[in-house]
């Protein structure tokens, strides 16, 4: 739409054009009050994106305030591009997770690729070098052709971007459930390393300093992407393909190197990624955080399409762009630096004292809005919350153990459930060894990356069992954080902090808002108990298709510190003769389990329960035993229960099996999903020391028979399974479904 054709302020109000942009009547009246006049078309656009849920968290802020966000190692909590945690020796780890769900539902390859690009920019805008990527993905059932297409394209998009940019994709998770059929979830996480003195903020300080635009040119892609992410998907969403941005990983690789060099220069004052809402959010937020204003001349914006209006330039979400503030008079140094990398750096404005965001185009002032009004003054809504109708019904159910006729067949069937099955088809497409720092590659409980020049490593994982959270949001929220920490501990790491990606349905529905509140309550309690503060994250609402919401999926991304790489521990058995231990008791807990879903085709009842104090005690014992060199392998017991965990530890080894004896009712002993459990192997000579340090029960030993045999307490054989056959079934399941 050219400037001549844009509706005037009166038309915007009378024809309710603001509503098409996502503003409510009350919000438009607020804008009118703030400005003391009717906004023009560009100004209406600025408010509509900055006040969208995606940018303002207006529906979720009251809930997010419950998260613990401070700790002795936390250097930067929520509010900047990414959170930062101290790891000693003047170094820190920077990490964040974000969603790109809606774009990936419409245009899966580019949606996923640009999700990766955006989260990388959040990390290097803090001054950190990105060292690892993870992703957490949710899809419908793989039997559906549409789901196959989305799955293949999303994985290809992540691989295409990550591999080209040269950052290893080292871990993550993929789960499949019918509720994600129309609305897949694509959550990307980036981890970076930084020295304390290099930390940069996205703030525009110093009146008279220069505002510069660096990186790729601006096109019409992604206009209103933030607003698109703040509404439910529908049949008409397909028409919004233009709202999906297109990424160029080679451009981003140059941008990373240029920005990391720039950060070493004292000419730089502030830097921020142009992410959701593009130029609007970066300029308004940088000005607002510094208590300043910004004036910008939009004719100077590098444009790759002709005739772009101020509205289009401000709302474009073209990729690979950064906004920087530099000291006045030092502009040429910056231009020269970026030119060396073949990138544009142009002066397009200046910092002012009057706290206004002022835009000029073709010699005319086209917008004048208080920066704080855009960045900080979105209305905050305390949404009505109502316990979901199904919850009381599920809580009251008398749970019966699912009937299993043949334990071996059940184990093989579980190993082929796509959520449990090997994800090798996925991660074989990722370059997880680039930078040659990956110590533990995908497929174990957590990935581990070396901190170069030290003996330290970073352990990292993403976790969330959304079935448990659907059944019991508070309990499930606790479990998500606890499982992430358990995975870090099993890898030899001390859990440090989390980033979260809260994926939910429409928060305007009281039952959905109840899920959000309760799961955040559970996560917050677990973060406090396990001492893993929340240092940043992302909220993705409106994950619905035709009124059907996805399961509540508050994904947890956690990073831990491996104090010495010799402590790195993996899940596979190491040698015959080692003793097998189980930590934690097994109860007949099947609500939301893989066995329940496999047998009944649906989930119901109560989720497994968790006692966070017990969880913490066990994690501390396991970590201390690992650090004392007493542990050969460690694996957390998750989906599929003990039989699956023991089988996975055998599958990962070569030519090893195990003979174990499990007490209690057979189906529960094998397949229940009780929490706070570990499978640990220990050298025979360390038996006494280990048993003194850890409350564990010896259940058997690792054998060289290449078979897993499980007995009951009467010594009757419940199942014997050949490890090669299990490996073949486990590895072949996803490729087979994709054929």
From Swiss-Prot:
Keyword Ligase: yes
Catalytic residues (positions): 54, 100
Positions annotated to bind Mg(2+) 1: 98, 538
Coiled coil start-end: none
Name of this protein: Phosphoribosylformylglycinamidine synthase subunit PurL
Keywords carried by this UniProt record: ATP-binding, Cytoplasm, Ligase, Magnesium, Metal-binding, Nucleotide-binding, Purine biosynthesis
Binding site for Mg(2+) 2: 122, 273
Record bears the keyword Cytoplasm: yes
Species, as recorded: Bacillus cereus (strain G9842)
């Amino acid at each position: 739409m050219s400037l001549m054709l844009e509706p005037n302020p009166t038309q915007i109000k009378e024809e309710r054009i603001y509503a098409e942009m996502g503003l409510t009547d009350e919000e438009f009246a607020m804008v009118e009050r703030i400005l003391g006049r009717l906004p023009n078309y560009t100004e209406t656009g600025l408010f509509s994106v900055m006040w969208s849920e995606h940018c303002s968290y207006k529906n979720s802020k009251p809930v997010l305030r419950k998260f613990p966000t401070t700790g002795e190692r936390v250097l930067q909590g929520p509010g900047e591009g990414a959170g930062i945690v101290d790891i000693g020796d003047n170094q820190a780890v920077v990490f964040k997770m974000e969603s790109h769900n809606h774009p990936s539902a419409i245009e899966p390859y580019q949606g996923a690729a640009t999700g990766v690009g955006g989260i990388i920019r959040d990390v290097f805008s803090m001054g950190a070098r990105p060292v690892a990527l993870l992703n957490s993905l949710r899809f419908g059932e793989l039997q559906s052709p549409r789901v196959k297409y989305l799955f293949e394209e999303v994985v290809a998009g992540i691989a295409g971007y990550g591999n080209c940019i040269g950052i290893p994709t080292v871990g993550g998770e993929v789960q499949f459930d019918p509720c994600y059929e129309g609305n897949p979830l694509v959550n990307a996480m980036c981890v970076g390393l930084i020295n304390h003195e290099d930390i940069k903020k996205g703030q525009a300080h110093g009146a008279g300093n220069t505002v510069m635009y660096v990186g790729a040119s601006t096109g019409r892609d992604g206009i209103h992407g933030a607003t698109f992410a703040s509404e439910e998907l529908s049949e008409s969403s397909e028409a919004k393909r233009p709202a999906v941005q297109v990424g160029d990983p080679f451009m981003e690789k140059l941008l990373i190197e240029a920005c990391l060099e720039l950060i070493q220069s004292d000419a730089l004052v502030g830097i921020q990624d142009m992410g959701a809402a593009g130029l609007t959010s970066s300029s308004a937020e940088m000005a607002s955080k510094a208590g300043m204003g910004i004036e910008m001349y939009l004719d100077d914006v590098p444009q790759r399409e002709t005739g772009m209006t101020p509205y289009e330039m401000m709302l474009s979400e073209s990729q690979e762009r950064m906004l920087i503030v530099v000291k006045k008079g030092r502009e040429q140094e910056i231009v020269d630096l970026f030119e060396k990398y073949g990138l544009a750096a142009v002066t397009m404005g200046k910092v002012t004292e009057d706290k206004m965001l002022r835009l000029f185009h073709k010699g005319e002032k086209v917008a004048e809005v208080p920066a704080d009004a855009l960045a900080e003054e979105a209305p905050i809504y305390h949404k009505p919350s109502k316990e979901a109708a199904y919850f009381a019904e599920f809580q009251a159910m008398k749970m019966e153990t699912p009937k299993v006729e043949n334990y071996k067949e059940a184990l093989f069937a579980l190993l082929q459930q796509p959520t449990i099955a090997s994800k090798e088809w996925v991660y074989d497409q990722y370059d997880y060894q680039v930078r040659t720092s990956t110590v533990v590659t995908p497929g174990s409980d957590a990935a581990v990356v070396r901190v170069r020049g030290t003996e330290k490593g970073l352990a990292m994982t993403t976790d969330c069992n959304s079935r448990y959270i659907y059944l019991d949001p508070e309990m499930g929220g606790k479990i998500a954080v606890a499982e992430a920490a358990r995975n870090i501990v099993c890898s030899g790491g001390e859990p440090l902090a989390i980033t979260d990606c809260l994926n939910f349905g429409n928060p305007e529905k009281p039952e959905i808002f109840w899920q959000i509140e309760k799961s955040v309550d559970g996560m917050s309690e677990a973060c406090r108990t396990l001492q893993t503060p929340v240092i940043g994250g992302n909220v993705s609402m409106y994950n619905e298709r035709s009124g059907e919401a996805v399961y509540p999926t508050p994904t947890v991304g956690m990073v831990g510190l491996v104090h010495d790489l010799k402590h790195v521990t993996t899940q596979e058995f190491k040698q015959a003769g080692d003793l097998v231990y189980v930590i934690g008791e097994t109860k007949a807990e099947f609500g939301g389990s893989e066995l329940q879903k496999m047998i009944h085709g649906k989930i119901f009842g109560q989720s497994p329960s968790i006692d966070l104090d017990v969880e913490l005690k066990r994690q501390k014992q396991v970590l201390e035993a690992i650090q004392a060199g007493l542990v050969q392998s460690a694996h957390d017991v998750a989906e599929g229960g003990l039989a699956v965990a023991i089988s996975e530890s055998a599958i990962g080894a070569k030519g090893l099996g195990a003979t174990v004896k499990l007490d209690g009712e057979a189906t529960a002993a094998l397949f229940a999903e009780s929490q706070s459990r570990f499978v640990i192997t220990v050298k025979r000579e360390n038996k006494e020391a280990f048993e003194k340090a850890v409350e564990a029960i010896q259940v058997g030993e690792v054998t060289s028979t290449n078979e897993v045999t499980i007995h009951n307490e009467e010594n009757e054989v419940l199942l014997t399974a050949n490890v090669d056959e299990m490996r073949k079934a486990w590895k072949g399941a996803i490729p087979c479904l994709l054929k």
